[in-house]
Regions:
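Solvent-exposed serine/threonine-rich low-complexity stretches and specific carbohydrate-binding patches
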Residues: 136-146
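Predominantly extracellular/luminal regions of secreted and cell-surface proteins
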Residues: 34-73
Length: 199
């Protein structure tokens, strides 16, 4: 009710943006509903063990133990619930603890161009029951994003038939450097993930 009232009022008074990131109030309300309201179906990855094959950068390595599987989405600032990699690719394995039937895996990314945080180029998902012999699930190429707005993007692999597995591997190809159109051209760029959702 409060969110609906807030949305109604900002429309009534023609509030164009909420902050310096140029997100409209309508976008804010939509994001809030999608990211922060309780969801009916819980992720199978909640509380799972995460093993990094390519560890996060700096302080994010220590934060990375639980952040990707704590059920909490990060906000528009990259200091809360986000794990980052700078100038490199990233890779990790989610251990569900036992073999389970899954239908989808989704990784949530942040785009904040002013902080040199860009969406990655590609995400590859694979799975294994034994943690050694992985079967490729899906490779997803992401379109380049140049907007100055803060954005979130879920990158999802789905299967119509259930897949029985214990381990899910996520491999991310980052941009590694700021591209030619970015004012940080040639300098290391980041990508950030806040949550992995498995259902």
């Amino acid at each position: 009710p409060k969110l609906a009232l807030f949305e109604e009022r900002v429309k009534e008074f023609n509030v164009p943006t909420l902050n310096e990131r140029s997100n409209s109030p309508v976008d804010y309300c939509k994001l809030y509903r999608e990211r922060y309201m309780p969801q009916k179906e819980k992720s199978l990855a909640l509380g799972a063990k995460v093993t990094y094959l390519i560890p996060p950068t700096g302080k994010y390595a220590a934060l990375g133990k639980n952040a990707l599987v704590d059920g909490l989405f990060g906000g528009a600032t990259f200091v809360d619930s986000w794990i980052g990699w700078e100038g490199t690719d990233g890779a990790f394995v989610i251990d569900l603890g036992e073999a389970k039937e899954i239908h989808s895996v989704e990784t949530d990314f942040l785009h904040q161009i002013g902080a040199w945080i860009l969406f990655p180029l590609k995400v590859v998902y694979s799975y294994a029951e034994d943690g050694e012999h992985y079967t490729h699930w899906r490779t997803i190429d992401l379109p380049e994003e140049r907007t100055g707005e803060v954005k979130f993007r879920g990158v999802k692999a789905e299967s119509a038939e259930p897949i029985k597995t214990r381990y899910v591997k996520v491999e991310v190809t980052g941009t590694k450097e700021c591209p030619t159109w970015h004012y940080g051209v040639g300098h290391p760029s980041w990508f950030f993930i806040d949550e992995v959702i498995i259902k």
